[in-house]
Amino acid sequence: MVKVPLGNRSYEIQIASGVLARLGRECARRKLGERCAIITDTNVGRHFAKPAFDSLVRAGFAPVLVIVPAGEEAKSLKTVHACYDQLAAHRLERKSFIVALGGGVVGDLAGFVAATYLRGIAFVQVPTTLLAQVDSSVGGKVGVNLKAGKNLVGAFYQPRLVLCDLDTLRTLPEREFRAGLAEVIKYGIIYDARLFARLERDLPKLLRREHAALADIVARCCQIKAEVVGQDETEGGLRAILNFGHTIGHALEAISHYGKFLHGEAIAIGQTLAARLSARQTGLPQRDAIRISNVLAAAGLPNCVRLTQRQRERLFAAMHLDKKVSGGEIKFVLARRIGEVVWGQRVPEVAICRVLDSRLD
């Protein structure tokens, strides 16, 4: 169990096999409300809506099931409005709560619905993908996309509980699982050189989804995220390090209309390019930049991208809409060495063009 230390808003991250069966009991113990809704998507719902629903019923709740389309395109204000309508139709009140059952899209969407419906009701995260378990379910960032860019509408709104059931990873498609490894690798780059070295050594165990290896890695990633969020909840400084690779990654997602790349795949490309920028601007040793590229490739993730001139123009336009832009300047998180990064680094467009054209030898 990992605790996110936020004073009277602190909460637990429970990580184990079979914790989904405890959902109802844990919600009842926390007295989250009298009524509840499960928000899930068409893919996850097939596997896990019934056990979640049954657990809540056993604890005395009468849950409402809200099913949204699967995929990044569902992370929109249109879907938010549809969720509001269903909650209102079933007369959920202030003393109600939402269960976000799914991956990062569902967690961000359902969390934003919880943050804004009736000016805020409680919610619980039940992440069912590796990416969501190690990253997006923890820390309270919730929101949706606009056509112009990713996560441009959102809030900081903490869950009351995070339940990471490792059994849910068994049904995860291989591509989705590998995409989640991008965020796992990120934690080694930004915070923990020993974790990075372990990933270089033990990546085959993770790719085989060995339970002990997964449990340890998910817990360590959650510990790092909890430590960072506990010090800087609303990204005034330190929390920005969690965005390593995300400036370019989010822009890639936006210009491909959230269809070509999974989130983790785009972030993997962004991390490789951020490592190249780091080698040029913040003294990251070239051998470390190569290690970053190699471990991403070993995880089966893309570490390069080819863009036409028109696509580059659109990429820069999307990056200028990034939340980290200040005074019209694109700001990056860059690495000094594996395990240590700096944030708020100004990077001129010409430098980004150079790394887009470069290769690591």
Language-model features, listed with the residues they occupy:
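Non-catalytic interfacial helical region
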Residues: 84-101, 110-125
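ATP/NTP phosphate-donor binding region
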Residues: 1-97
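Short glycine/serine/threonine-rich phosphate/pyrophosphate-binding segments
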Residues: 105-112, 133-134, 250-251
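Residue-level signal for inorganic ion chemistry
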Residues: 16, 38, 76, 127, ...
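C-terminal charged capping/lid subdomain of soluble metabolic enzymes
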Residues: 182-184, 283-361
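Solvent-exposed alpha-helices and their adjacent loops that cap or buttress functional pockets
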Residues: 5, 31, 91-93, 116-118, ...
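Active-site segments that bind and position negatively charged phosphate/pyrophosphate groups
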Residues: 197-313
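A glycine/threonine-rich phosphate-anchoring loop and its flanking beta-alpha core
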Residues: 112-205
